[in-house]
Structures are given as structure tokens and as C-alpha cells.
Amino acid sequence: MSDLKTESQDLQQEENTLIALRKEKLAAEREKGQAFPNDFRRDSYCNDLQKQYVDKTKEELEAAAIPVKVAGRIMLNRGSFMVIQDMTGRIQVYVNRKTLPEETLAAVKTWDLGDIIAAEGTLARSGKGDLYVEMTNVRLLTKSLRPLPDKHHGLTDTEQRYRQRYVDLMVNEETRHTFRVRSQVISHIRKFLIDRDFLEVETPMLQTIPGGAAAKPFETHHNALDMAMFLRIAPELYLKRLVVGGFEKVFEINRNFRNEGVSTRHNPEFTMLEFYQAYADYRDNMDLTEELFRELAQLVLGSTDVPYGDKVFHFGEPFVRLSVFDSILKYNPELTAADLQDVDRARDIAKKAGAKVLGHEGLGKLQVMIFEELVEHKLEQPHFITEYPFEVSPLARRNDDNPAVTDRFELFIGGREIANAYSELNDAEDQAERFLAQVAEKDAGDDEAMHYDADFVRALEYGMPPTAGEGIGIDRLVMLLTNSPSIRDVILFPHMRPQA
């Protein structure tokens, strides 16, 4: 342990020495004049040049003498050649000691890895076939005071990668790729819905009554109004108010906040897509979701087969559709339908499975507890799990044939919930009764039970058309498409405990 501590202290001392040297160099730049100039305008990106001129030979480039202006961070320094990196990729720049002024050559010798430079020159190709910029002018734009991670080991400490994402992005192409994919996914989802006549909207992040999901909220205080407010746990009730108002197809991509545990699948602040369409039901949403997921896989991976860890999920095949009840029996053949239909036996099964049983739960709630403990983690390939009991679905429409369950599904892939959807409850009186039942659950000790929202009931009293709604966790979806093991890998700045 003491050896590790000594090594850490030595590394810290070495870093402090390097920082001090860089600060001396910055002081020298300040003496010359403006140390952080902002008058350079590039006309090209590094990787765009690599793609555009990939077929040009050394002789063709020499004859064309194509002028370019590039800028980026120095990632490698090989003496005469430096490698710079911008948002698109990398390119080499050549320090020609025969043509560059002595003053410039002297300045180049003082530059360090991590410094940001501007380079002007013409494109050329090396004997090895590498494209580079033969510089006619180069200057320092930003002095980096902290050294980059060691080039051989990189930034490998996972926690440091999350805490210092800016460094992670500089040195890890895999990280940059993940967040480019995330942006691509969100952009395509937006286009997918807009092309189908959905209207993008924004609803309150600060709410007086947290609703739309079973979760524990973050509470804050509005000083001017002297009242408690909550960061939203879901936008659902506001989006359905918009459907009542006549916006029949709406969606929102935004943040939700839940004051709950942190894990590889949970972050207190996360991104959700929620969409609602009138004159549709939950089966329409299943079809729409399959279509969307296939398009996203094809867009990102060029295939509907999605590799994740040591598994491959097949988005090109029809997603399995099973009820909660049937899935328990399928994946637990030792159980019988009679076991699940008797409240005392179901309670015993839930307890033995490890569920937190309080004792007041109804049969439907116990069935869901059994499902969560004994089935959920087994759902590897895409599964739509349907017909959730109404006790755990206070906002969903009851099934016409079996009023004990609702027209609802959750989508599971790799044992994780990715989406939740249902045919919306639009009976104002039924909704009021279910809110009252949720209040009773909360009074009995269920912190995640919903509050009574009188204004939402009033909105339903004006009449909401038959509607289907859905929420999709963007972070978990991006995890799948980028083969990322932790939700922190797909959130730029995940929540972390403060460093000691």
C-alpha cells in the first residue's frame, strides 16, 4: 500500500513540475503580446481532408498545391511532424525547417502536447502514403498548462474518465464515437417522429405535483412563491393535457430526475423520449417501436443485429410479445397458474424471490414483484411484456376482456427495461379513483406511489380522445447501440460523489 502511495506522490510531483514549466512558457507568451489570440479562421477539418483527398497521389497533390487552414490540439510530436486533432479526427502537419522563419521554428520547439495551434499550408503526401499539411505558417492559439495522460497508458481509470470527461474526450476515440452516436440517435428519433406528424413540445421541469411515474422526486423550494416544488420525474401528465387541448401527436426529449439509487443502469438525471398519439392504442406503439429500433440499429451499426457484451440482440426479428402472467409461467415452469392467482401463495413466492413485501399488496402488485425478481433478468432478446395489472398502472386503460389488467407493455432487451407504454386512461372518474388508491398506497408506506393531481383529472373531464403513449430511455438505448456496459459511459457528465 505504501509503495502505491509513494508512486502516486511521485507522479503528482512530476505533474506539478511539468505544470510549472508550462506556466513559465505561458508567461513568456504573455510578454510577447496576446497569449490567447482569436483571429484565426480555419477553412478545413482534419478528417474531411483525409476523406476528400484519399485518392490523390503524392504527385497530384504537389502539382495542385491545395491551400488549407487547419487548427487543433497537438496529440503527437515527432520533431518535423506533429499530429493535430480537431472535432473530426487527425492530420499531420510538417515543420519544414527550410521554409519556416527562424522565429517560428524557435517557437515550435517550446510547444507541448495538448497545445492548440493554427496551421496554414498546402496538402502533400508522405512516402508512406500519409496525408499532411506542409506548413507555410503556424502559431500557438492556446497554451495547455496540464499535460495529457501518458500516451502509452492513456486515461484508463474509469472514475477519472467520468470526472474529467473533457480529458477522456481528448484522448479516447471510443468515447468520442459513443457521444457522436448518441447525438445521431436523438437526431434520428426526432426526424422519425416529425416525419410522422408529431409535434415537438416542452413541458415544465419544475412541478408543484410530481406525477407521470412511480418514483421518488427531488424536492426544492421556490423562494418568491414560498412553496415546495419538485424536479419532474416524468412529463406524462402535461403531455396528455396537450392531447386534451388538441395537439393530437406530441413528443418531448428531455431530462427526468429521480431521487433514487445509482447503478450501471440508473443515474438520478437521465434523458427520456415520451410521445403520445391520439386514435391509437398500445399495439400501435409496439409496431412503431419495432420500426424505430430497427432503423436506429441500421443507422448506427449498418445491421439489425446488435452486439452487446458476449450477446447479439436481433432487432430484425419480430419482438416477442408475452403477458406478465404468461412470462412468469414460461420462465418458471415450477410455478402454476393457481400459484399466481392465490394472493397468499403469490405473497410467499414474492418473499422467497427476494421482493420487499410490505403485506398490504394486492394480487396484481405481487405478480409484478414476482416478475421483476424471477423473469426480468432473463429477457435477453427483445420482449414486449404486456397486460400489467391495473394496481401498478394507475395511468393506463383497463383491458376490455380482462379489467384486472391494462393495455400496457414494457420493452425489455438484455434484461433491462428500455420502454414503457400503454393505451392511456381517458376516463376521468376512473382516473380519480386510481389516484385515490395511489394516495392510500403512499400513506401505507410506498414512497413511489403517485400524488393526487386534481388539475389533470379536470383536464380529462373536458375529454381526451383514445390515446397511446410511450416513454423510451435514451441512455439505455444508447448503451445498447454502443455496447456500453454502464449508463455513465453514455452520459457526458454523470453524477459522482465529490472527491475527498
Swiss-Prot record:
<comment type="subunit">
    <text>Homodimer.</text>
</comment>
<feature type="binding site">
    <location>
        <position position="417"/>
    </location>
    <ligand>
        <name>Mg(2+) 2</name>
    </ligand>
</feature>
<dbReference type="InterPro" id="IPR018149">
    <property type="entry name" value="Lys-tRNA-synth_II_C"/>
</dbReference>
<dbReference type="InterPro" id="IPR012340">
    <property type="entry name" value="NA-bd_OB-fold"/>
</dbReference>
<dbReference type="GO" id="GO:0006430">
    <property type="term" value="P:lysyl-tRNA aminoacylation"/>
</dbReference>
<dbReference type="GO" id="GO:0005524">
    <property type="term" value="F:ATP binding"/>
</dbReference>
<feature type="binding site">
    <location>
        <position position="417"/>
    </location>
    <ligand>
        <name>Mg(2+) 1</name>
    </ligand>
</feature>
<dbReference type="Pfam" id="PF00152">
    <property type="entry name" value="tRNA-synt_2"/>
</dbReference>
<dbReference type="InterPro" id="IPR045864">
    <property type="entry name" value="aa-tRNA-synth_II/BPL/LPL"/>
</dbReference>
<feature type="binding site">
    <location>
        <position position="410"/>
    </location>
    <ligand>
        <name>Mg(2+) 1</name>
    </ligand>
</feature>
<dbReference type="InterPro" id="IPR004364">
    <property type="entry name" value="Aa-tRNA-synt_II"/>
</dbReference>
<keyword id="KW-0963">Cytoplasm</keyword>
<dbReference type="InterPro" id="IPR006195">
    <property type="entry name" value="aa-tRNA-synth_II"/>
</dbReference>
<dbReference type="InterPro" id="IPR004365">
    <property type="entry name" value="NA-bd_OB_tRNA"/>
</dbReference>
<dbReference type="GO" id="GO:0005829">
    <property type="term" value="C:cytosol"/>
</dbReference>
<dbReference type="GO" id="GO:0000049">
    <property type="term" value="F:tRNA binding"/>
</dbReference>
<keyword id="KW-0479">Metal-binding</keyword>
<keyword id="KW-0460">Magnesium</keyword>
<dbReference type="Pfam" id="PF01336">
    <property type="entry name" value="tRNA_anti-codon"/>
</dbReference>
<keyword id="KW-0547">Nucleotide-binding</keyword>
<protein>
    <recommendedName>
        <fullName>Lysine--tRNA ligase</fullName>
        <ecNumber>6.1.1.6</ecNumber>
    </recommendedName>
</protein>
<dbReference type="GO" id="GO:0000287">
    <property type="term" value="F:magnesium ion binding"/>
</dbReference>
<comment type="similarity">
    <text>Belongs to the class-II aminoacyl-tRNA synthetase family.</text>
</comment>
<keyword id="KW-0030">Aminoacyl-tRNA synthetase</keyword>
<dbReference type="GO" id="GO:0004824">
    <property type="term" value="F:lysine-tRNA ligase activity"/>
</dbReference>
<dbReference type="InterPro" id="IPR044136">
    <property type="entry name" value="Lys-tRNA-ligase_II_N"/>
</dbReference>
<keyword id="KW-0067">ATP-binding</keyword>
<keyword id="KW-0436">Ligase</keyword>
<dbReference type="InterPro" id="IPR002313">
    <property type="entry name" value="Lys-tRNA-ligase_II"/>
</dbReference>
<keyword id="KW-0648">Protein biosynthesis</keyword>
